[in-house]
């Protein structure tokens, strides 16, 4: 491709609203442009990268036995109501009405559509297992789109769905697609980890996320320093044991704590260690209000709260709800005096507190010398906190460290969550009607492009791995007015294309500095510069990833490049 014919508008300055490297560089290099908040156009070079990631995804999915189809982006609300997710999915689901006031959703995911499709066609175990996938634009009404392609409102996704007669069949396909995902991200050149995860609004169990390691990742990975254990921090169980002090219990006392609301403030004001404080939070679990307690130096894990109750939706209660429930502000919450019809659950660590501190459910006051069970009752002690660095690894090997990650893939064993709700059944080998057993498997294709850009860049621009680079080789005649340079550049361009390489020829009448700056921004694996030694049959070859350069005779160029790109 000749650069003079390509739409690739570059930017010299960093866009003000671009916070992270991938967002900045994809804009500066002219790979994409923003249309609205969280909505982007892929320009020609960006689209080539996107297509290359798609190709890798298709190759590995089909190698794993999946078959491609394409489903509609618009989905009838009746299907979502049938599955029970129309109301539980939340405000991120983009909803709309047609001119007849019929409700639809713009697809954020396709479990309902694929289950409806398969239940009408697959009636016998003889047609199972079946794995179908699509690569399609998805929509999500993000409250705060940010980080470019990493958190957008419109994005390209590969979603796959498998259907089975037995759990063993699901396990086998899940394992195969887990391997396929590992192959996909490895072929993209990414440094990633597969971690134990939460199924969230998808439902089901046994799920893993594929995380690209990056400091800008919005997820925290908890991993062992000595074993292969890794999990999303939401899902890492705490296996710590707590020993109760033999300190004698003291009389409960209410003390004034004016303007002291946060644990750190109360702890300092009362000269009590944070681990002796009881942090109280009120959650709305589906429609039920629950008081959740953790130690002052710990944080409540809302996913664990959700799992305790098997709830669809868990969110913090509003100030108004707390005021109505306990007649106090958030900074004064505590378990003492909570009426019996309001359930209190607590993390294991709370049970070991002796003569602790808690809010008094009265503005500007706290209790000291608080002792669980004596001063308040807990209906259940369980694991409710986030794991922390330094905690024992859940597998018993080593201690926990943290890393940040960008989620690019997620695989789920859905089981019969959707098939039972939507009456998707088959006849087994004994003629008995059973619900289809399902799995689902997603990859953020456009997000993967951003993750690659986030891992592969330097101070001058992008540094694409050869597997996804828009072109393999960038040929740059320095002076297009020089017949020798221009003709040699075109000859190299043509001969490399004949050898099967994708080549970009910078045939623009621009200054050398502009050409080299753009070349660094684009980040193609190999740059061939045709300069003043063209008359001698010599060019300069530079490897973008390492910065190494060498003068090479034109007749040796193809072999030299082949060794670089092998």
From Swiss-Prot:
SUPFAM superfamilies from the UniProt entry: Class II aaRS ABD-related, Class II aaRS and biotin synthetases, YbaK/ProRS associated domain
Transmembrane segments: none
CDD domains: ProRS-INS (cd04334), ProRS_anticodon_short (cd00861), ProRS_core_prok (cd00779)
InterPro entries with a match to the protein in the record: aa-tRNA-synt_IIb (IPR002314), aa-tRNA-synth_II (IPR006195), aa-tRNA-synth_II/BPL/LPL (IPR045864), Anticodon-bd (IPR004154), Anticodon-bd_dom_sf (IPR036621), Pro-tRNA-ligase_IIa (IPR002316), Pro-tRNA-synth_IIa_bac-type (IPR004500), Pro-tRNA-Synthase_IIa_type1 (IPR023717)
Enzyme Commission code: 6.1.1.15
UniProt key word DNA-binding: no
Primary location class: cytoplasm
This protein's record includes keyword DNA-binding: no
Domain of life: Bacteria
NCBIfam families xrefs: PRK09194.1, proS_fam_II
Name of the protein in its database record: Proline--tRNA ligase
The species this protein was found in: Bacillus mycoides (strain KBAB4)
Gene this protein is translated from: proS
């Amino acid at each position: 491709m000749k650069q003079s014919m390509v739409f690739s508008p570059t930017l010299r300055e960093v866009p003000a609203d671009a916070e992270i490297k991938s967002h900045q560089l994809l804009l500066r290099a002219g790979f994409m442009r923003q249309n609205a908040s969280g909505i982007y156009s892929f320009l020609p070079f960006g689209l080539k990268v996107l297509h290359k990631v798609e190709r890798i995804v298709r190759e590995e999915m089909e190698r794993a036995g999946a078959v491609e189809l394409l489903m509609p982006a618009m989905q009838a609300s009746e299907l979502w109501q049938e599955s029970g997710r129309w109301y539980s999915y939340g405000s991120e689901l983009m909803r709309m009405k047609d001119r007849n006031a019929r409700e639809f959703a713009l697809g954020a995911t396709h479990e309902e559509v694929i289950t409806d499709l398969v239940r009408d066609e697959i009636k016998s175990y003889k047609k199972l297992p079946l794995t179908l996938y699509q690569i399609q634009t998805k929509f999500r009404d993000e409250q705060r789109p940010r980080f470019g392609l990493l958190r957008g409102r419109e994005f390209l996704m590969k979603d796959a769905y498998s259907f089975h007669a037995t759990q063993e069949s699901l396990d086998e396909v899940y394992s195969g697609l887990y391997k396929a995902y590992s192959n996909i991200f490895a072929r993209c050149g990414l440094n990633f980890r597969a971690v134990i995860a939460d199924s969230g609004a998808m439902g089901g169990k046994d799920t893993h996320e594929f995380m690209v390691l990056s400091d800008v990742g919005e997820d925290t990975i908890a991993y062992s320093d000595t074993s292969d254990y890794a999990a999303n921090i939401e899902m890492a169980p705490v296996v710590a044991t707590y020993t109760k002090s033999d300190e004698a219990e003291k009389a409960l006392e209410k003390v004034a704590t004016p303007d002291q609301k946060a644990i750190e403030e109360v702890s300092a004001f009362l000269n009590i260690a944070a681990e002796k404080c009881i942090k109280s939070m009120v959650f709305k679990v589906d429609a039920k209000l629950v008081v959740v307690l953790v130690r002052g130096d710990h944080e409540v894990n809302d996913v664990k709260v959700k799992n305790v109750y098997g709830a669809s939706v868990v969110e913090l209660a509003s100030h108004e709800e707390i005021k109505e429930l306990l007649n106090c502000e958030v900074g004064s919450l505590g378990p003492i005096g909570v009426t019996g019809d309001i359930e209190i659950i607590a993390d294991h660590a709370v049970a070991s507190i002796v003569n602790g501190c808690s809010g008094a459910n009265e503005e500007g006051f706290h209790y000291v010398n608080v002792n669980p069970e004596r001063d308040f009752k807990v209906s259940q002690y369980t694991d409710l906190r986030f794991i922390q660095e330094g905690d024992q690894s859940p597998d018993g090997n080593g201690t926990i460290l943290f890393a940040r990650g960008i989620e690019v893939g997620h695989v789920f064993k859905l089981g019969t969550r959707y098939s039972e709700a939507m009456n998707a059944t088959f006849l087994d080998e004994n003629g008995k009607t059973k619900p289809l057993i399902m799995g689902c498997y997603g990859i953020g294709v456009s997000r993967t492009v951003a993750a690659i850009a986030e891992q592969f860049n330097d101070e001058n621009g992008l540094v694409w791995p050869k597997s996804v680079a828009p072109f393999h080789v960038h040929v740059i005649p320095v002076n297009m007015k020089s017949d020798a340079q221009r003709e040699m550049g075109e000859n190299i361009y043509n001969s490399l294309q004949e050898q099967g390489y994708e080549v970009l020829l910078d045939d623009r009448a621009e200054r050398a500095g502009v050409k080299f700056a753009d070349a660094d921004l684009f980040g193609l694996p190999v740059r061939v510069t045709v300069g003043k030694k063209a008359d001698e049959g010599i060019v300069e070859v530079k490897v973008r990833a390492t910065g190494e350069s060498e003068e090479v005779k034109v007749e040796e160029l193809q072999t030299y490049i082949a060794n670089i790109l092998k």
